[in-house]
Each structure stands twice: as C-alpha cells, then as structure tokens.
C-alpha cells in the first residue's frame, strides 16, 4: 500500500466547485489516496468521486468534540475511512492542564463511539499545541500521555516545527502512536504564508520521513501563492523520487 496521500483541504475551492474534477486531477498526478475533510457534508461527492477515480481515503478530518459523532463515523465507515482525525482544538484550550485533560477525555470517549463503527479516532496539531508549555513540556506531549491507546496522532510536521519543536525528534518520542504525518514546506510562518512544495523550504523533510517510516505521508497546503495542483504535483514528485 502506498504511504502517500493528499489533504483535500489543500484544494478546497476547487473541490467545492467541482469535486469530481478535483479528484480526477489528483488521481492524474499519481495519488491513489486522499484525506477528505467534512465527511458528513461531502459524503455523496466522495462516494462517487473516490470510486470513479480509483481512490481510497484511509484517513479524514472532521470535527469530533461537540459534534454528532455517530453521523461522522457512519459516513466515514461508508466511505471506507478507517481513521477520523479531529483537525484542531482552539489555542486557548492548550494553556491549562485541566483543559488539556478535558480534551484528551473527550477524544477517549469519542474513540469508544468510533469503535462501534469499526473506525479509529485521531488528533492533528497546529503550532500552538507545541508552543504552549506545561512544566517545560509541550502541551501536545502532555496531551498525548493522557490518550487512550485507541486514539492515534497525526503530526503536522510543518506546524510542529513552526511551534518550536524538532519535528523528527518529536516523532521519535511519540513512536508508533503516529499513524499519519502532514508533509509541507516553506518559511514556517504561522499565518500560512510562504508555504512551498516539499523539499523547497526550511523543513528537514528527509529527517522527518526517516523518523516516521511507517506513517501515512499526507501532502498539504494551507495556502499557496500559485497553482495548487502544480504545487501538489511537485510535492508528489519529490516524495516519490519520480524525477521524470
């Protein structure tokens, strides 16, 4: 199975306008897997578009805390998605140990609901979970310590680096709890400006990939000043070593 995927949020405008064509273009680049967002609202478009283009979606992003979790997990199961990842919890919830514990408890509870649908739960970081420190440790690692083993992690290596962490070292500490990583590059600005295809920015991509050799590698752009499909194709070329 390929270890390469792409987050559909990267091409959210194109996907909203024409999901079928967007998935076709990503498949033409060479992707066989995608990471959707908003599985409930996009379930019909994804059901048709994935099948038509020979794509699968092993992971997806969807808000879980405070959401209609049975509906999310039912849609995920219908689409063959095995891991549903909560994409963010707001920065103010990462400053106090009690708030961090509450977030961990909420995802641990969500994992029990997900299991009824044969789906797993995960969490995806931004920079603020790493920037915030609790007794000298990154809030993200304090949080990870409190998760049930059934809850996976998707480490956004760009945001972790922007938050002040050595992403490769972080991956090493978290170990096989990391089931997926987001791979992007650029100047590490927290406002998402200056993002670049993999291998063209400041992130030590080779070290990051070596630190999580079995994790799904999900290409993502929060923003890009140019043609997003060309940028995604450049990342695909870099990550596959296809220099044709």
What are these regions (language model features)?
Residues 26-33, 51-57, 150-153:
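Short, surface-exposed connector motifs at secondary-structure boundaries
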Residues 1-28, 40-43, 77-82, 117, ...:
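Histidine-acidic metal/acid-base catalytic patches
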Residues 34-40, 61-65, 154-157:
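Catalytic beta/alpha-barrel core
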Residues 33, 65-152, 173:
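Active-site acidic/histidine proton-transfer and metal-coordination neighborhood
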Residues 38-49, 93-95, 99:
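Active-site-adjacent beta->alpha loops and helix N-cap segments on the catalytic face
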Residues 5-17, 59-66, 94-98:
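Active-site mouth loops of central-metabolism enzymes
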Residues 57-59, 85-86, 123, 155, ...:
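Hydrophobic residues in well-ordered beta-strands that form the structural core
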Residues 47-62, 108-110, 114, 141-148, ...:
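Alpha-helix-loop-beta-strand connector modules within alpha/beta enzyme cores
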């Amino acid at each position: 199975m390929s270890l390469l995927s792409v987050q559909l949020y990267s091409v959210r405008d194109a996907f909203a306008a024409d999901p079928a064509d967007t998935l076709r273009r990503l498949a033409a680049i060479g992707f066989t897997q995608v990471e959707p967002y908003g599985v409930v609202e996009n379930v019909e478009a994804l059901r048709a578009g994935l099948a038509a283009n020979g794509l699968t979606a092993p992971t997806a992003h969807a808000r879980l805390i405070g959401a209609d979790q049975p509906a999310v997990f039912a849609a995920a199961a219908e689409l063959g998605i095995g891991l549903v990842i909560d994409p963010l919890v707001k920065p103010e919830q990462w400053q106090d140990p009690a708030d961090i514990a509450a977030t961990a408890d909420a995802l641990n509870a969500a994992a029990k609901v997900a299991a009824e649908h044969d789906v797993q739960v995960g969490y995806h970081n931004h920079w603020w979970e790493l920037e915030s420190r609790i007794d000298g440790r990154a809030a993200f690692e304090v949080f990870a310590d409190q998760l049930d083993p059934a809850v996976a992690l998707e480490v956004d290596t760009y945001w972790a680096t922007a938050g002040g962490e050595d992403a490769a070292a972080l991956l090493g500490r978290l170990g096989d709890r990391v089931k997926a990583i987001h791979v992007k590059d650029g100047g590490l600005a927290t406002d998402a400006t200056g993002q670049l295809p993999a291998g063209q920015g400041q992130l030590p991509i080779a070290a990051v990939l070596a630190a999580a050799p079995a994790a799904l590698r999900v290409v993502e752009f929060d923003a890009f000043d140019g043609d997003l499909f060309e940028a995604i194709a450049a990342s695909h070329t870099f990550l596959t070593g296809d220099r044709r």
